Design a protein with these regions (language model features):
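Compact beta-sheet-dominated domain cores in extracellular/mature segments
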Residues: 1-215
Length: 215
């Protein structure tokens, strides 16, 4: 993985390199990911420029290494964008530790992935709330915070989040560690009213670090 990432953790539903691209964004090469069935870029290989809701439908038993050439992506543990989610920014992911980072959750392969289209590192704003439904103490952020408590947030919990622009990845623990939650302006209108909106696998509202997604 790159040192930059270490400093921070109507169209067809999917398309491989043999399928036509259907948008200006894709025709400009905005998104491209290469996946392999085995670790260290071995075994069956395919390139994608659009979402893939089920890698098994493309002949893969699993995906165990990845190279992101353009754009940020999200990888999911299960088909149809289910299970734990992992941010995939530009760079090499030769094995599962590369995308899971310091997560306590061991996910050795991925089975679906999609693009993050609203990421804008230079224009990202998010508001954190103490209580559900955007109530209680709030704090607006425009930068990366490896420790929310060091920044002044008084709790280990963030009960609701409103993404005003860009895309963010929130982490369970300080230092961009633990479970990852991808928060996007163009999903759910940027409104995450309770912690179960963060992810289908979110078990609590514990969030202690957050950063902008690179694009």
């Amino acid at each position: 993985m790159s040192t930059e990432r270490e400093r921070r953790s109507g169209a067809p539903r999917y398309a491989g390199k043999d399928l036509p691209m259907t948008s200006h964004m894709e025709s400009m090469g905005q998104f491209k990911i290469i996946v392999w069935e085995e670790e260290n870029f071995q075994g069956k290989r395919s390139e994608f420029m659009m979402e893939c809701p089920n890698a098994m439908e493309r002949g893969f038993r699993k995906i165990r290494s990845i190279k992101v050439e353009n754009g940020p992506w999200i990888g999911f543990e299960y088909p149809e964008y289910q299970g734990q989610q992992f941010i995939l920014e530009k760079g090499d992911y030769p094995h599962w530790e590369a995308w899971s980072g310091n997560s306590a959750y061991r996910t050795e392969n991925l089975l679906s992935f999609r693009t993050i289209r609203c990421a804008n590192h230079n224009d990202s704003r998010v508001t954190l709330y103490e209580s559900e439904n955007f109530q209680g103490i709030k704090f607006e952020l425009t930068d990366d915070y490896p420790s929310l408590q060091a920044m002044g947030w008084c709790s280990k919990e963030v009960a609701s989040i409103k993404v005003l622009s860009g895309a963010w990845v929130a982490y369970q623990y300080p230092g961009y560690r633990g479970y990852q939650y991808i928060l996007e302006r163009d999903r759910q209108n940027g409104e995450y009213r309770k912690y179960t909106d963060y992810s289908s696998q979110a078990h609590s509202s514990q969030i202690q670090s957050i950063r902008r997604i690179q694009h």
